[in-house]
Each structure stands twice: as structure tokens, then as C-alpha cells.
Amino acid sequence: MRTFNYSAIKEQKWDSDVLGLIAAIYKEAGKQELYLKQRPEELEKLVEIAKIQSTEASNAIEGIVTTSTRIRQLVEEKTTPRNRDEQEIAGYRDVLSIIHESFDAIPITQNYILQLHKILYSHMNNPLAGRTKSVQNYITATYPDGHVETLFTPLAPYETPEALDRICEEYNRVIGNMELEPLIAIPVFIHDFLCIHPFNDGNGRMSRLLTTLLLYRNGFYVGKYISLEAKIAKNKDLYYDALAQAQTGWHEGIEDVVPFIKYLLGTILAAYKDFEDRVVLVETKLHALEMVRRASKNRIGRFNKQDIRELCPSLSDSSIEGALRKLIAAGELKKEGKGKNTCYFRLN
């Protein structure tokens, strides 16, 4: 049986990359706190966009999809699920909403994790919702020629409940005693959770929901305004590579979790940087044309209307479209493609 001792982690010597990421995140979190005090109403516009993106991206990573219009309607609770994928999407929405509203009242225990998993599947008939796995699961890769390779074998079902209890106890102990930096403890906990793989289904999505919960409980609220799940989805190969590196030797307790820590901290810092970019556009009272011009300058290479919408949440679609037309006419942007495939890029 794998053992867990989070106190031992504090003896590890961290390289300058890890220490630099932690320092930068604290600096950005401090800036965010000031922005939230100064302009809370304007920043609320970012919350709904982040909810939609998080729900869409985290499910898409697992191949659970529907149209963008349906995602928006489901997240805004303006429609009911039509199929299994939409049932799973609605469940994710529900858990994310609970975390947003009540994170400080959700202790990190096996019981609460099981309850959140049950809510994740509350829109469908899943007899294993809210229960740890009943059969051995495997982390696999399927190759173009069709053959499947087992990359990692998680804990056996009979070991899972005790292991889940232990990582919760260890995490709560080192955080409660202030033994370990939260930005180290959080990725270590999430990595152990993914190695245990406690459920028959929903492990990846639960890991991302728990990441948000743990960050909120430690005062890092960036995920409320910028979707961490969308950032992971954009770089999911890096996510899986970091996870695979960190899993080597896990059963023997000799794993090197640093690649996963660096990946997760890098993702969190990138989200804070995005938050700052969007705040600059929200807080300055600009005309739509200038706001879209500045937003386009924040993009490298090709971008679409959705990219601008995310940076300019206060603008209507018609205002964005009008500004894009003017920038094209002025020779600042070039348009490519038609319909859903329309994209733009800067000419200077």
C-alpha cells in the first residue's frame, strides 16, 4: 500500500523556477485583490465567461462536447440536457457553481469529495456516482494504428478509500499547521488524487474542480475570472506529459512531482497574467473601436471574434463586429475565412 507523508515535502530543495513561479503568483494575487476592491461590478462580467469556458473546456478534454450555443444555455440554466454529454456538462456546471458560492464551507475530506462526484452525475442514472471505483482502472494511450498502451496503473479498488482518506488528512494537516506552502501542497494533492484515480469515471474533471476548490480555499481566486480549465485544454499535451513524468515511481514513493508542480503553477500564473490584461481593458473607459484595437494587440497570430469577446466582456457582439470591420477598413487587420472559420490577424 502506498504511504503518504506531506511533511517530508518541506525538506525538499526547490529550484529557482518553482520559487520564481510561487513569488510571481503571490504578486499577481495581490494585484487582483486591489482590482477587485476598486472595480467589483465591472469584473463580474468576467465571471460568467469563465464559467462557460471552464465547463466547456474541462468536459471537452474528456471528449464530452456539445455546441457553443448549447454550452452557454446549459451554464446559464436556460435549457435542460438533451443527451448524455449534456447531462455530464450540466453536472459539471452544478459542482462548479457550488464551489464558486460555498468553497469556504466545503472541507477537504473523502465524504465531501464523494458528494461532489455524486452531484457531477446528478443529471443521469449512474449507480456509481458518489462511490469509489468498483473495478481496476488504467491510464492508457491509443495510437493511430489502434493499439492501446497502458501508461499507468492506479491503485486497486480495495486500496482506494483508505488512500483518499490519507491524502485528505495529510493535506489538511500541513495546511492547518502551516507546514507547507499551499502552492506546493495543492499540486501534490491533485497529483496524488490522479494517481489514485478513485472513480470509475470522472477523475480528470474532478481533479480540475478540486484544483479550483483548493485554490479558492487558500485565497487564489483567479479561476473565478479566468478559466484554468481552458488553459489546460489549450496545452493538454503538456498537461499529460507533466503528469506522466511525475507518475513514474509513484507506487514506490520515489516519484518526482516537480514537473507537475511547475506545470500547474505555470498555468495559474498565466491565468493571472490574462486577468491583468482583461482588467486593463475593462477599467479604462474606451470606445468600442479602441477597446477592440487594444485587445487585438494582445493577440499573437490569428484570432477570432470569441478571443476578442473574452477580452472585452462589456461589449456586445454587434459592437465587436463593427469595430473589427473598421479596423479592417483602416488596414490594421486582415480577415480570413467565412462563417465559423472566420479569423483575423494584425498587419502592423
Where would I find each of the regions flagged by the language model?
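FIC/Doc superfamily catalytic core
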Residues: 1-348
